[in-house]
Amino acid sequence: MPKVIVANINAEFEGIENETIMQILYRNGIEIDSACGGHGQCTSCKVLIISGSENLYPAEFEEKDTLEENGMDPETERLSCQAKLNGKGDVVIYLP
């Protein structure tokens, strides 16, 4: 099973394909802000991708647009409510 590894709290959690980073964190008791309720309309749930971005499905237009409008780089920052595991490997993130 692929894992989400949270570098700054030294934790790792198993996930499944198509599960968002936010879902994995919530399921494991890690609270993350979500002003828009997980609909990809804000950036309060953003995470930094340290490695393994190839193990996430690419950001869709709406997510990229939201990130870019707020001065963020969609290659290294993702909305945890939108970033889904593709099942191919682990992703290392940093929670701001």
Curated annotation (Swiss-Prot):
Q: How does activity depend on temperature?
A: Optimum temperature is 106 degrees Celsius at pH 7. Highly thermostable.
At the top level, the lineage of the source is Bacteria
Stated role: May be involved in the assembly of iron-sulfur clusters (Isc-Fd).
> Where does the chain bind [2Fe-2S] cluster?
36, 42, 45, 81
Q: How is the cofactor bound?
A: Binds 1 [2Fe-2S] cluster.
Q: Which residues form the 2Fe-2S ferredoxin-type domain?
A: 2-96
Family annotation (PROSITE patterns): 2FE2S_FER_2
Disulphide-bridged cysteine pairs: none
GO BP of this protein: P450-containing electron transport chain
Which coenzymes or cofactors are required? [2Fe-2S] cluster
From the Swiss-Prot or TrEMBL record, what is one GO molecular function term? metal ion binding
Keyword Cytoplasm assigned: no
UniProt-recorded name of the protein:
2Fe-2S ferredoxin-5
Entry's family note: Belongs to the adrenodoxin/putidaredoxin family.
Q: Which InterPro entries match?
A: 2Fe-2S_ferredoxin-like_sf (IPR036010), 2Fe-2S_ferredoxin-type (IPR001041), Adrenodoxin-like (IPR001055), Beta-grasp_dom_sf (IPR012675)
